[in-house]
Amino acid sequence: MYKKGIYKILANEPLTATVWRMVLGGDTQWITAPGQFVDIALEGRYLRRPISVCDYDATTLTLIYKVVGEGTAQMSRMAAGGELDLLTGLGNGFDVHNAAQRPLLVGGGVGIPPLYSLAKRLTAQGKRVTAVLGFNRASEIFLAEEFRALGAEVVIATADGSAGIHGLVTDGMAAVSDYTSTSYSLPSLSVLVSVR
């Protein structure tokens, strides 16, 4: 079930050279699970932009997006006080009801943001979360400190070796041994095959 609504932009700020955090105020009751997404209508654009929800509470939701084209570039120019037309409550999200005690979360780049609200939910349940986060280089790292603030163990992998483990997020996974069978992933197909 989804809901259309108008949301107020409370903040829109860069986290890295190409990754931005937007905080929106409005009715979030249709977002019921970590891992869901919203569709954003942009002025002058025919197609809505799907963006995963990084975090949410009763009155706000946080989106983290990468500027890769004209639509997301348009989003990066939006200022606090503006409004956006959103469809919320899209996607199934993650099932957290049967999570193991030591779940492993694996994400690369913009696949990381929806894992944050998942980590938040799991740590609130008393789970000992390990998050393996993959980036191209150290200058592109975001959300690592936020995961740590939740109490999650964080393993960083960078393709160029400038921070953490030198390699892909799958190389970061190889460095983790203390987790149980539940794993959650939002990266590329090759990573999903490795998680399996």
What are these regions (language model features)?
Residues 2-82:
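Ferredoxin-reductase
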